[in-house]
């Protein structure tokens, strides 16, 4: 009978390498049995294939043909593994792991894995030419060990040539091409048994097929992939430990359906009793004075803080594609409000550093650690962006990029690795929870210490509002002030949203002691904890808890202790979410979509390692006694994410770039109305599904970033519906300005100017030669944005304008307008070292351009002086005296 698992592809003999087939015996109950998705066609059923076979015989007339089998190829319907299959496989792999764990060197480990039943069977059934193949490839002992680990883990199909695994796809259209492809499989299955002696084939290759240079490259890349898994997941047993964890989680998932959930949860968390409570929070909306004080602690502690960005996610839901190349792009490259999301993060950080300079007169450059991945060339895109923007005027030494490994995607049915082609498993990033171990492995913690840092703020790239007003500064300030280990920024949760919740965990351990701490439960685990994701009106339990936003403060030393753990603790809350479809193209370009997932862990669940122990059960308030805490603010000041593409014909704008823009506009409305500026209110999202927003307002964060600071730069006026206000400037004064149309102010030196460091890199010097703009009693009237244009993309800040009033300030240029109406289209471009004044004249505008005097070149003719007054910041506009 033809082997159902050996279907090599036929290649030309030149410049190819012979490889092997795998003839694993399968049975309907075999845990790792692999099947064709559909029956293969046979030679006997196709005259065209018979004729082609005769041609092949004529071309090979110098070669002896042993025999050709026309027996139908075996085909079996995939059978989902039963519980016993999982348990027996888990037991086998755990036994193997324990033996490997006590083996002190590679030689001993190799001896252990050679004794594994799967490995023995594999090499005994594929002994022909294997050693020669591996020798030709130049595999060293470690690479051979990795290959054996894959086999021992039951994933030898990742090494096989040209067969398909059955994952039970629900719907698949069988094309003529697919049928022909299957027929070719059968043809080649027979041809492989020929005794070939022509040029390029030496000797009898009864079990051989060939690899071309591309496939050899895939194999080499596959070895690198395996080595990264083996090294990074060493804390759980490498490749084999990864598969054990996958199978255990799948088994738990099936067991959960038939077992008391609370018992399962308590068993998995290793405790006798577990209860979740609604956590107490530090509500920044109710305690404004305390919020101001906490934010000041955050500013004051900026020299002790680092910044961490986990950017490694695949962001598949965003569907971002380069319009020119067609390449899939990572979320960090999404152009939102005129700049990439990564640029937005750095701009927010620089705004806080600018505020620190204005208060204390000192430069402060925060070191930034960025976790990337190979998904969608994430690492290359992020690196290139940083280089192109000259490291944002911060110097390359203040950035540390570290790349997370990719992990194999697995079938939801049986935990088998999903393979798109030989040596190419479908792979995804292993979740942002790998960041702590990876940071330790890559020396990121020591790098932060070398920069004198004690703590760090963590935010995700898709959240565009996390730095609004006091949220981020208060979070960090409280963590530093009270030596906390971990803090969460939280808010009200939107029912049904794909976001987790923060909870207060109460556990009774088997030793009789009690533990308490703030934790997070991801939405994918609501079912595990028996939490309903219904709307509040349906009394869903999730409505009682605040949202987890993945905005964190972390004590670096505490995080390092967890990341350096030599066990599973370094990978917090490992989960296997198999409720999504894995989509991929095979080597023939055929599309596949299967239910699956990958082993991932959650960054925020490092909190589970920071619980506080008590000898007895606690009652009443615990906040002061815990190492974990929550600050709480209005949702649109905490989280609004651009993480998924707006669905067609859908009214759901939540977590889309469109919805994120609306929240930015709502924040702008809240801020400016507090400054006595009249403007229309932003309505609910569903109002703007098919309509543009009522206006476009984008403000540079360095105008604050604290709203207490921003409010002192704006006073009175109005912004009409269908108007636009964009301010790319920090030194700005607005007094009774009316905008009916478009007003754009852009300062080249919004926060300062750059000077070269010792390496010749441009470094931003805050407060040096800033561009400045004053608008007092000014009316701006023009036709503004063409709101009827079909090509406008408002969230991208890509709009067509009919008219605008645009002020461009080069270098330290200044612009002043007072008691004037600026009507129609105008572009005022002020050169470096000059001031442009506009007032009313007899025949319209009176325009006066004059050079700045030498004594005010650095400071400007005026500036905002920031002074601390208790827990508040007071601004005073200072005119610089000139001789």
Swiss-Prot record:
Keywords: Chloroplast, Nucleotidyltransferase, Plastid, Transferase, Transit peptide. It is an enzyme of class 2 (transferase). GO terms for molecular function: UTP:glucose-1-phosphate uridylyltransferase activity. Induction: Induced by phosphate starvation. GO terms for cellular component: chloroplast. Its main location: plastid. It is found in: Plastid, Chloroplast. GO terms for biological process: sulfolipid biosynthetic process; UDP-alpha-D-glucose metabolic process. Its cofactor is Mg(2+). This is UTP--glucose-1-phosphate uridylyltransferase 3, chloroplastic.
């Amino acid at each position: 009978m033809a082997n159902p698992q050996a279907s090599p592809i036929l290649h030309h003999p030149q410049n190819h390498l012979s490889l092997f087939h795998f003839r694993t015996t399968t049975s309907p109950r075999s845990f790792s049995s692999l099947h064709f998705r559909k029956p293969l066609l046979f030679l006997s059923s196709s005259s065209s294939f018979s004729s082609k076979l005769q041609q092949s015989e004529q071309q090979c007339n110098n070669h002896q043909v042993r025999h050709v089998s026309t027996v139908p190829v075996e085909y079996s319907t995939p059978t989902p593994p039963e519980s016993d299959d999982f348990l027996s496989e888990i037991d086998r792999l755990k036994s193997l792991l324990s033996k490997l764990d006590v083996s002190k060197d590679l030689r001993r480990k190799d001896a252990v894995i050679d004794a594994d039943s799967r490995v023995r069977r594999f090499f005994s059934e594929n002994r022909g030419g294997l050693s020669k193949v591996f020798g030709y490839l130049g595999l060293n002992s470690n690479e051979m060990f990795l290959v054996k680990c894959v086999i021992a883990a039951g994933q030898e199909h990742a090494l096989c040539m040209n067969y398909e695994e059955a994952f039970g796809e629900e719907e698949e259209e069988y094309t003529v091409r697919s049928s022909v492809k299957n027929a070719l499989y059968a043809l080649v299955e027979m041809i492989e048994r020929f005794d070939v002696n022509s040029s390029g084939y030496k000797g009898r290759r009864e079990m051989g097929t060939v690899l071309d240079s591309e496939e050899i490259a895939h194999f080499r890349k596959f070895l690198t992939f395996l080595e990264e898994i083996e090294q990074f997941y060493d804390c759980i047993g490498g490749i084999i430990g990864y598969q054990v964890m996958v199978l255990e989680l799948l088994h738990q998932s099936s067991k959960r359906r038939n077992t008391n959930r609370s018992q399962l949860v308590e068993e998995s968390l290793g405790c006798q009793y577990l209860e979740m409570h609604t956590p107490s929070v530090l509500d920044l909306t109710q305690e404004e004075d305390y919020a101001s004080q906490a934010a000041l602690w955050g500013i004051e502690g900026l020299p002790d803080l680092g910044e961490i960005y986990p950017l490694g996610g695949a962001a598949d839901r965003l569907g971002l594609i380069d319009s020119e190349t067609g390449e899939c792009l990572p979320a960090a490259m999404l152009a939102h409000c005129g700049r990439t999301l990564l640029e937005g993060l750095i701009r927010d950080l620089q705004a806080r550093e600018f505020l620190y300079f204005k208060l204390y007169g000192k430069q402060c450059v925060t070191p930034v650690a960025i976790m990337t991945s190979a998904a969608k060339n994430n690492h290359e895109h992020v690196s290139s962006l940083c280089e192109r923007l000259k490291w944002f005027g911060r110097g390359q030494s203040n950035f540390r990029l570290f790349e997370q490994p990719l992990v194999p995607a697995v079938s939801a049915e049986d935990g088998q690795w999903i393979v798109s082609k030989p040596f190419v498993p479908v792979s995804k990033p292993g979740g942002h929870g790998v960041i702590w171990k990876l940071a330790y492995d890559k020396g990121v913690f020591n790098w932060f210490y070398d920069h004198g840092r004690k703590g760090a703020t963590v935010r995700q790239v898709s959240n565009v509002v996390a730095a609004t007003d006091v949220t981020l500064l208060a979070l960090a300030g409280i963590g530093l002030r009270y030596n906390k280990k971990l803090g969460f920024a939280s808010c009200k949760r939107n029912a049904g949203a794909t976001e987790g919740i923060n909870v207060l965990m109460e556990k009774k351990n088997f030793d009789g002691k009690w533990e308490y701490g703030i934790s997070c439960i991801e939405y994918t685990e609501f079912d595990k904890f028996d939490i309903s994701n219904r709307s509040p009106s349906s009394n869903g339990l999730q409505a009682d808890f605040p949202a987890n936003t993945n905005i964190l403060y972390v004590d670096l030393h505490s995080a390092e202790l967890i990341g350096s753990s030599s066990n599973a603790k370094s990978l917090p809350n490992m989960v296997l979410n198999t409720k999504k479809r894995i989509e991929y193209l095979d080597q023939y370009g055929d599309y596949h979509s299967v239910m699956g997932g990958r082993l991932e862990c959650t960054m925020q669940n490092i909190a589970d390692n920071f619980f506080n122990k008590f000898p007895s059960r606690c009652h009443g308030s615990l906040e002061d006694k815990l190492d974990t805490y929550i600050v709480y603010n209005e949702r649109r000041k905490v989280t609004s994410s651009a993480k998924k593409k707006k669905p067609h014909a859908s009214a759901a704008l939540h977590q889309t770039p469109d919805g994120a823009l609306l929240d930015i506009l709502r924040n702008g409305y809240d801020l400016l109305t507090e400054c006595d500026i009249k403007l229309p209110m932003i309505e609910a999202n569903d109002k703007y599904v098919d309509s543009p927003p009522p206006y476009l307002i984008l403000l540079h964060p360095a105008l604050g970033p604290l709203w207490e600071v921003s409010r002192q730069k704006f006073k009175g006026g109005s912004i009409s519906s269908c108007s636009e206000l964009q301010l790319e400037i920090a030194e700005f004064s607005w007094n009774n300005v009316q905008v009916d149309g478009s007003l754009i102010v852009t300062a080249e030196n919004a926060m300062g100017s750059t000077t070269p460091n010792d390496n010749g890199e441009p470094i931003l010097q805050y407060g040096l030669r800033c561009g400045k703009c004053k608008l007092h009693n000014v009316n701006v009237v023009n036709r503004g944005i063409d709101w009827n244009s079909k090509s406008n993309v408002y969230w991208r800040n890509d709009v067509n304008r009919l008219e605008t009033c645009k002020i461009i300030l080069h270098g330290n240029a200044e612009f002043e307008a007072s008691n004037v109406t600026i009507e129609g289209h105008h572009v005022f471009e002020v050169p470096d070292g000059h001031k442009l004044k506009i007032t009313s004249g007899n025949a319209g505008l009176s325009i006066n351009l004059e050079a700045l005097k030498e004594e005010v070149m650095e400071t400007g003719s005026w500036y905002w002086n920031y002074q601390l007054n208790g827990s508040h910041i007071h601004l005073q506009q200072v005119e610089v005296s000139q001789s």
